[in-house]
Amino acid sequence: MIWRRAALAGTRLVWSRSGSAGWLDRAAGAAGAAAAAASGMESNTSSSLENLATAPVNQIQETISDNCVVIFSKTSCSYCTMAKKLFHDMNVNYKVVELDLLEYGNQFQDALYKMTGERTVPRIFVNGTFIGGATDTHRLHKEGKLLPLVHQCYLKKSKRKEFQ
């Protein structure tokens, strides 16, 4: 996936439309397959529609497993800004997926709803586990539980690198 750092936003990452790989292309490929299926050009309609439905979930799961901290956000959301600032202030690297900048952001938000039970943003994952929104994340931080979760992930990733 191709991501570009936003200069004024610290470690905030946004989708770069100049890249040819990533969620937009994969989701567009699934949407194209579904359109072909609907027009009769595809012989296996049900599998094409399944691909369309599972593409966002697969991309979300891949992003979550590849990064210790992932924040699914919207650029205009004050709670999202608050959550990103918390991780920035803790000097923790994180990946942000700005749903409102993605062409298929609504499908990703629908997939996040199915995974977490909420449509609101931010949706925050640490060490592969959904921890909640901004309020939940701040509570974990105040209780002293957030940083240990992050460190646990970094330790796990460094051990994997040792054995590769």
UniProtKB/Swiss-Prot annotation:
Give yes or no: UniProt keyword Transcription: no
User: SUPFAM superfamilies of this UniProt entry?
Assistant: Thioredoxin-like
How activity is controlled: the entry says: The 2Fe-2S present in the homodimer leads to inactivation of the enzyme. The 2Fe-2S may serve as a redox sensor: the presence of one-electron oxidants or reductants leading to the loss of the 2Fe-2S cluster, subsequent monomerization and activation of the enzyme. Unlike other glutaredoxins, it is not inhibited by oxidation of structural Cys residues.
Phosphoserine occurs at 20
The record's section on InterPro entries has: Glutaredoxin (IPR002109), Glutaredoxin_euk/vir (IPR011899), Glutaredoxin_subgr (IPR014025), Thioredoxin-like_sf (IPR036249)
List cellular component terms (GO). Answer: intracellular membrane-bounded organelle; mitochondrion; nucleoplasm; nucleus
Indicate the residues annotated as transit peptide.
1-19
- S-glutathionyl cysteine: residues bearing it: 77
In Gene Ontology terms, what is a biological process of this protein? regulation of signal transduction
Q: Which Gene3D superfamilies does this chain map to? A: Glutaredoxin
User: Which cysteines in this chain are paired by disulphide bridges?
Assistant: 77-80
Q: Where does glutathione bind?
A: 74, 109, 121
Q: In which tissues is it expressed?
A: Widely expressed. Expressed in brain, heart, skeletal muscle, colon, thymus, spleen, kidney, liver, small intestine, placenta and lung. Not expressed in peripheral blood leukocytes.
Keywords attached to this Swiss-Prot or TrEMBL record, sorted alphabetically, are: 2Fe-2S, Disulfide bond, Electron transport, Glutathionylation, Iron, Iron-sulfur, Metal-binding, Mitochondrion, Nucleus, Phosphoprotein, Redox-active center, Transit peptide, Transport
What's the subunit arrangement here?
Monomer; active form. Homodimer; inactive form. The homodimer is probably linked by 1 2Fe-2S cluster.
The protein depicted here goes by the name Glutaredoxin-2, mitochondrial
Which organism was this protein described from? Answer: Homo sapiens (Human)
Its taxonomic path starts at: Eukaryota, Metazoa, Chordata, Craniata, Vertebrata
